[in-house]
Regions:
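Carboxylate/His-rich catalytic cores and anion/metal-binding grooves
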Residues: 125-165, 212-216, 225-258, 314-328
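Extracytoplasmic/periplasmic ligand-capture domains
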Residues: 75-96, 194-195, 270-296, 349-355, ...
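Helix-loop-helix "hinge/cap" segment bordering the ligand-binding cleft or interdomain interface
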Residues: 141, 168-240, 261-307, 314-319, ...
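Conserved small-residue motifs centered on glycine
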Residues: 42, 387-516, 525
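Extracytoplasmic/periplasmic substrate-binding proteins
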Residues: 235-258, 281-448
Length: 558
């Protein structure tokens, strides 16, 4: 077993490294030189019908609603896991916010630095790299090969093995990816009831959208006395969230935290390109006109959303799931009181806007070197893939809790290990199935679940399911995905390797400086030409070294 003491240098590095979604490198690790002795002792054979106990750590989710008497520590899902697969899960700790949020990441950083890890947990790409170098996690190659079912192995290879490769170092599987689809577009969401009220046409260009935002702010269609044009929250950089600016930036052909073609056969960093400066110039102009909440830089998504729910903002950018969030203000007392519609990203020029996307996984399930039963994590993964794709009636407990019926409680979020379909044909299937009410078209459990919710809304059984229609119905968000695929409008990050040495050392500082100057520019606290100084500083403070390392990787992995 490894030496229990980490060097002071490593501890300081782990404590200092930022792990929140705005500072952790979103590129994905692939083969790289691992630390030595990464293979832990082989797990002891577990006698059949013996329950094994393993620990993990959790982050609370605001969309999870517990049945009476249940908690994160004691609930129907944990009980079912112990009964069905003989794995008793305990939580070492539970904190507020998602597992990419600051509270969870700060707690996990300290757990890593003090060598106080649970048996298994979810790590970011940067954390995965650090944990390998610190010799704190197990090589899962043999355990995965032995305990993963054929279905699990096939499920995680549907992308040709890219995501599994990203968790593999020198041929050793160090982290099992929380797989997902790379097709995660951003949309611009607009209050269409306000468009009708003010006799405004639907937007076709970025210029149209800005005019709509100006009119919403000036005319105050919500009658509140104070309206803004665009909802923005302090985590504006989040590419798969809502109330951010990534979709807006993409409309200027600017991309956040991506390595993109430099036109010379290499890669360059997106944050420092001229397109970013032009997008920031436009945002600064919007801020000066009063189109953006002056307090956005200190408001999280929920706080900024109060302005949306209170009829003060009618435009925002967000992922396809955004209507589930908007429903909090859009549906009241069994009636839809706010009408929203998604639009594909709008462009500032004649070239269609691409929506940026990544590899499809930003999280890895890892097992502590001290864990006695690494196979438990694989068993949990096997179980999830079964119950999330083709559950029996009894296994619906994993999705709905004891009732085994849809009630909006989101019990599936209690599963401690997850993996999602790397492909996604919801856009090709759901809008047509819902429009024609043809269940025979449905191919996956997710599609059947979404279809059922949409039907409840259409049949008048449950108006609160309005949000599912806006996601999956005709004209809903997913109906745009086939067009985006067909016209190659997903802009992929071309670097998906392990964080380079300079990224590990300098990325946090560089991203902090970026966020500081970008927010100042937007809020008109710094002139737009401060962007040029930021670019110079970025290069001097490690950006040039990072670019060199990325291009060395790119040359070897094209």
């Amino acid at each position: 077993m490894r030496n229990m003491l980490l060097s002071l240098t490593l501890i300081l590095s782990l404590v200092a490294t930022a792990c929140t979604s705005n500072t952790a490198d979103t590129s994905q690790p692939t083969t790289d030189k691992p630390a030595e002795n990464t293979t832990a002792e082989k797990p002891a054979e577990t006698p059949e019908n013996t329950v094994i106990e393993v620990s993990t750590v959790r982050a609370k989710d605001p969309y999870l609603k517990f049945d009476a008497g249940e908690t994160y520590d004691k609930n129907a899902v944990y009980d079912a896991l112990e009964k069905d697969i003989g794995v008793k899960v305990t939580n070492k700790w539970v904190v507020d916010g998602g597992n990419t949020g600051p509270q969870f990441q700060e707690k996990l950083k300290m757990a890593i630095a003090t060598d106080d890890l649970p048996d298994f947990f979810v790590a970011t790409p940067a954390q995965l790299q650090q944990l390998i170098e610190a010799d704190m996690i197990q090589d899962l190659t043999e355990v995965y090969d032995k305990y993963a079912t054929d279905e699990t192995k096939e499920f995680l290879m549907r992308d040709g093995g890219l995501q599994m490769k990203s968790g593999t170092f020198d041929g050793k599987l160090m982290g099992v990816p929380e797989s997902g689809t790379a097709f995660t577009p951003q949309f611009v969401w607009v209050r269409t009831d306000w468009l009708k009220k003010l006799n405004l046409p639907e937007p076709k260009t970025m210029q149209d959208l800005i005019k709509i935002m100006e009119t919403f702010a000036a005319k105050d269609p919500g009658g509140t006395g104070k309206s803004y044009g665009l909802a923005v929250n302090k985590e504006y950089y989040e590419p798969t969230g809502a109330l951010g600016l990534v979709g807006f930036l993409n409309g200027y052909h600017a991309y956040m935290k991506q390595w993109i073609d430099d036109g010379k056969g290499g890669l360059m960093y997106s944050d420092i390109q001229p397109e970013m400066k032009e997008a920031l110039r436009s945002l600064q102009d919007m801020f000066k006109k009063g189109l953006i909440d002056p307090e956005f830089a200190v408001k999280d998504m929920m706080k900024e959303s109060e302005l949306i729910f209170n009829n003060q903002i009618g435009v925002l950018y967000g992922a396809e799931w955004t209507p589930a969030h908007l429903a909090q203000g859009a549906v009241k007392d069994g009636k839809v009181i706010q009408e929203w519609k998604p639009f594909r990203l709008l462009s500032i020029d004649g070239t269609e806007a691409s929506t940026q996307t990544e590899l499809g996984t930003e999280k890895y399930n890892v097992v502590s070197k001290k864990a006695k039963h690494p196979e438990a994590m694989i068993k949990l993964l096997n179980n999830w893939i079964v119950v999330d794709n083709h559950p029996t009636e009894e296994q619906k407990v994993y999705e709905y809790g004891k009732s085994r019926k849809e009630s909006g409680n989101n019990y599936w979020q209690l599963s401690p290990v997850m993996a999602f379909n790397q492909g996604n044909n919801n856009g090709e299937i759901l809008p047509k199935a819902i429009e024609t009410k043809d269940e025979s078209l449905l191919q996956t459990k997710d599609q059947r679940r979404r279809y059922e919710r949409a039907m409840k809304y259409l049949n008048g059984e449950d108006i609160s399911m309005w949000w599912e229609m806006l996601i999956s119905g005709p004209g809903g968000a997913v109906s745009n995905t086939p067009y985006l695929k067909e016209h190659n409008l997903f802009h992929r990050n071309k670097f998906y390797g392990a964080p380079t040495p300079t990224m590990v050392e300098k990325q946090e500082l560089l991203l902090r400086k970026r966020d500081e100057i970008f927010v100042k520019i937007i809020m008109n606290q710094a002139p737009i030409d401060e962007f040029d100084k930021f670019v110079e500083d970025w290069k001097k403070l490690g950006g040039d070294d990072m670019t060199k390392e990325v291009n060395e990787w790119y040359a070897a992995n094209k």
